[in-house]
């Protein structure tokens, strides 16, 4: 991230192939480094900006220069002069908030002269009256009638004062309001008429209610001084999926008989401000905070909806969007309920006030309200939009298309502007129509991966593909992908590391002998096991591995064929069954049988099961996300339920992340997005297996929903040799608890009460989160989950109870599939 203190440090150059747009180049800037270090850097040649946020000041000077720099850029911009003008029009924003956002605004009478098109034709709002003037002179009679009716209207309630002010971007910060008692009709009319003379087109004169200080119920402490008013400033940011998120709330407290503004009061937290005014009861303060959050997020949602209907010219460029918003509220007591009333929208002032609060020497003592930097969600949005800019147009080769559960890949690629080229064994795969280039190549026999990698590299070169990266998210194709990257000179973890992680017994045995340094060593997390290729291997293994144990396919996926075995006869019986039923790819496509059907026996460890999804770049851990799994239906190990974020204590969560990270490094996995399955035992984390690719099932979707981090985008960036900029301590925006549906257990429900259409309709209404994992309802002995159904909530308990009720109503819960038991780990 770079800070440019002068417009002269930046320049715009025409963008080739994009008429009317320009690239922004940086020749000089302040750069920031860990430990608080800053440097003034000169860039030769200049660097290309991938995101621009301008400080749009008022009037001539640098603000105007910054506005011109921000216009019509090829890179994303977080503000523009055109959007700022809209937000600085109090009348327009009040109408927008009242009509679109359902946000309380002051009762307002507006006299507008040649109003902008966005104001025309809007539905009338309660307490918001627009009077369109044909001219600025000769309006005395109309003004008097309208003002008199307004001052007598019920919309003002018990208001004793009104303010008269000008509205329009020209007047922002340049004029003081004029206060009048409500009873002084003549004075109000005279002020309105005087201000009408200053109007230009698309400007207005506002007569608005001035709310007295809310009479807060006193706490147990001494009564506060009379007449204290609270002005609340909320900063809200645009996050993943254009969803508003409250970032921080800061308040000012002052005398109620004087205008309370940003620079004439000290910033403080909402809790401190309300306590100074006599409200210290925790539940009431929490209720006020929730109302402020709802109103602020609704305000930004209304602004984003307005922007969606604007042309690129009206926004100031194709890539111009409002990424953050400051909303100023007055706190009123309407009907005995403390209600925030939106006064105006701004950006810089609210952000500045929050920064001032964070900069106080006592900030570390302020508690949870000061834990997160106000700019954190904004910076995440900047980085996300910057990443999209970097990746747009990148040429990527995808090896293996996968099934219906991976349909999101093609949708996301279109959204990100990626140019995908696909290698796939199925010539009729639906994804063949969704890519730039389709290469049909039979790669089902993975014991020929080295030969196939050379052949594929020749095909890529013959087609003249200029690739930026190559990656796979499909288990069967991971080693082939690493070999192909090696042939093409593209970034990837080494083939040796991929082979080590792909073969489960090899993973465990390698890590068992990895004693460090560094310490704690990966050997602490590995589990004793024995590879099985024959009945003789089984006989030897039952004497080497403590029983009960777990038998599974060496190269398997989706827990197919995984079984708890109690003694030697069960081991022999299960080995015989698997070698008979699952001999090749045709017996069960997509679970690794192209590698053969060798098995392993590993020690069964007691404990709770967890997934850790990691993003690594150059051997450094960039991000980690931990989720919890419910108890499985022994002797099988098909997943039943899951919860995110984890309910583990912070120390245990850190142990899981470090164990997963060390196991990946121990296998040589240095670059990529990986999924590591572990159990937390009394002695610490124990490794189940490493999946050297992005987590499957619902994981990418849940992480995107809760944290705003897209593992797919991170994976393709790493594949292109680009380091993803991810939040080091991402905040979850809620909780998700889900349950798997199996055809063997839910065929009747999935064909009736919980049909695909019913589940999709509930998903579309936001009542559940559906992740479809299979296309058809086909029962079988060796099955994978058909779908995942989840519910969201502000707490794991609420999400769990919602899901349980839903499963009972849909027929997913039952005696043979006790959902309450599967969710019991999440209490």
Swiss-Prot record:
Residues the entry annotates as binding Mg(2+) 1: 677, 689
Q: What does this protein do?
A: Catalyzes the synthesis of carnosine and homocarnosine. Carnosine is synthesized more efficiently than homocarnosine.
Q: Which reaction does it catalyse?
A: beta-alanine + L-histidine + ATP = carnosine + ADP + phosphate + H(+); 4-aminobutanoate + L-histidine + ATP = L-homocarnosine + ADP + phosphate + H(+)
By its UniProt entry, which InterPro entries does this protein fall under?
ATP-grasp, BL00235/CARNS1_N, CARNS1
Protein name (record): Carnosine synthase 1
List each copy of the ATP-grasp domain by range. Answer: 516-720
This entry's comment on the bound cofactor is:
Binds 2 magnesium or manganese ions per subunit.
Q: What is its EC number?
A: 6.3.2.11
Q: Where does Mn(2+) 2 bind?
A: 689, 691
Q: Which UniProt keywords apply?
A: ATP-binding, Ligase, Magnesium, Manganese, Metal-binding, Nucleotide-binding
List, alphabetically, the Pfam families matched: ATPgrasp_N, ATPgrasp_Ter
Q: Which cofactor does it need?
A: Mg(2+); Mn(2+)
Subunit structure, as described in the record: Homotetramer.
* Origin superkingdom: Eukaryota
Q: Which residues lie in coiled coils? A: none
Where along this sequence does the record place binding of ATP? 542-611
| Residues at which Mg(2+) 2 binds | 689, 691
A GO BP entry: carnosine biosynthetic process
Protein residues bound to Mn(2+) 1: 677, 689
- GO MF entry, a single one: ATP hydrolysis activity
